[in-house]
Amino acid sequence: MNNIGSSPNKIKCHIWAPNGSSCHTFYINIDEHTEWLEHPLRANGVDIVGIPIIFTSDVGYTTQNDINNTDTIPLHVASDLSIVGYPLGLSVNEHLPIWKNGVIASEPDVKISGLDYFYIDATTKEGMSGSPVFSHEYTTQIIVSPEVHALYQRRQRGELDALQFISSIPPESLNNTIQVKKFKLIGIYSGRVTVGTSMPDIGIVWKLSLIEEMLSSKNLVKSEYPPY
């Protein structure tokens, strides 16, 4: 937490019941006894931590694998993205986050100061540090008719080879399409860039690879700087 201008002493969390019937709120206190995971390059400036949470059987949670959020979305300068968090503490019905949009402002594959992060152009506010950042784009999907689905099942059972399957699909069925927005978790937002005394509305996003490295390193440390 070196060189950080503010330090929270409590984190408010919302967890839904497994059936979605209710939302449970709890707090994680941050003090000199708190332990968290740090990235091995924390001393070099990698500004992310992971706080272990033990879930009981009466709460539900969803992982990236559960929702199959593995779509391949190419990242480029000016690619659209969303930062999902609580700007100035604002929320919907006391627990749902706000989605703020922005664009990638630097080459996403080029390291900055030797570290895996990139800049975004977005109007972010206090309370959004630690927010997940998603890229997104629209893709075209074909709405499959029952007849085509039946052909697909026959192909799965080995009753049709690939050529027979393709030639059996009515051409007009390929015209029934829909636009679907796909999302991909690409990193964690950690704050805004300051140039002298000015703030150019440029934010920092640490890449997902750093989060994976932090979790695999299992570098568990205690809070070196108690909140103030």
PLM features: what roles do these ranges have?
Residues 1-3:
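Short amphipathic, basic-aromatic surface patches that mediate peripheral association
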Residues 135-228:
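C-terminal subregion of chymotrypsin/trypsin-like serine protease catalytic domains
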Residues 5-115, 121-122, 126, 130, ...:
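Serine endopeptidase catalytic core focused on the charge-relay Asp
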